[in-house]
Amino acid sequence: MLAILDYKAGNQTSVRRALDHLGIPCVITADPEVIQGAAGVIFPGVGAAGQAMNELVTTGLDEVLRRQVQAGRPLLGICVGCQIMLDYSQENDTKALGIIPGECRLFNPAWTDEDGAPIRVPHMGWNHIVQRRPCELLKGIEPEAEFYFVHSYYPAPPEEYVIATCTYGAEFCAIHGGPGLWAVQFHPEKSGRPGLRLLANFHRYCTEAADAQ
């Protein structure tokens, strides 16, 4: 079973619908015992980084997530969840979880697209990613696959944590982390077949990791 973290800055219902479609057992929960007993945790997020961190700290879920990582249990951050897994976000001058090194930065409105026009912020719509290193999440997903993005800020971890990039005015990190600890800037639950495959890959990894214990 996968646990979807329940706090006031997430799009938990959309994630659950995607997992239900795949036939993957899941529960939306803020219960630390349920989270600890899950094969893996999905950490979605929408809205502002500061608000999301406030909710996590107020409920104590920030420490629950840190313990999840310290115990080596799989975690997948989505959108704002992806951003606040880093040390810091420029949005609201937010001290974040510090699970993965790096910071989250605002898109530069002076950047231009391939036609020379200034980019619009937020980055909203479908875009393809470029895989930079092997990743279990991307197994079986075509290189030309597109994912759905909605964000004004982008993650900027150290190069060794960058798994895939996307280009919007400039190249930015679209997936970061490492085995069992991943963060995706796009919304897999809204990305059609490629997004569903990514979620299925995460579940498979979690199941295999749990069976190996």
Curated annotation (Swiss-Prot):
Its main location: cytoplasm. HAMAP family: HisH. The keyword Amino-acid biosynthesis applies. SUPFAM superfamilies: Class I glutamine amidotransferase-like. It comes from the Bacteria. Residues 1-212 form the Glutamine amidotransferase type-1 domain. The lineage of its organism: Bacteria, Pseudomonadati, Thermodesulfobacteriota, Desulfovibrionia, Desulfovibrionales. The gene is hisH. This is Imidazole glycerol phosphate synthase subunit HisH. It is found in: Cytoplasm. The active site is at 79 (nucleophile), 187, 189. It catalyses: 5-[(5-phospho-1-deoxy-D-ribulos-1-ylimino)methylamino]-1-(5-phospho-beta-D-ribosyl)imidazole-4-carboxamide + L-glutamine = D-erythro-1-(imidazol-4-yl)glycerol 3-phosphate + 5-amino-1-(5-phospho-beta-D-ribosyl)imidazole-4-carboxamide + L-glutamate + H(+); L-glutamine + H2O = L-glutamate + NH4(+). Pathway: Amino-acid biosynthesis; L-histidine biosynthesis; L-histidine from 5-phospho-alpha-D-ribose 1-diphosphate: step 5/9. Signal peptide: none annotated. IGPS catalyzes the conversion of PRFAR and glutamine to IGP, AICAR and glutamate. The HisH subunit catalyzes the hydrolysis of glutamine to glutamate and ammonia as part of the synthesis of IGP and AICAR. The resulting ammonia molecule is channeled to the active site of HisF. GO terms for molecular function: glutaminase activity; imidazoleglycerol-phosphate synthase activity; lyase activity. PANTHER family: IMIDAZOLE GLYCEROL PHOSPHATE SYNTHASE SUBUNIT HISH. Heterodimer of HisH and HisF. Disulfide bonds: none annotated. Keywords: Amino-acid biosynthesis, Cytoplasm, Glutamine amidotransferase, Histidine biosynthesis, Hydrolase, Lyase. GO terms for biological process: L-histidine biosynthetic process. GO terms for cellular component: cytoplasm. Its EC number is 4.3.2.10, 3.5.1.2.
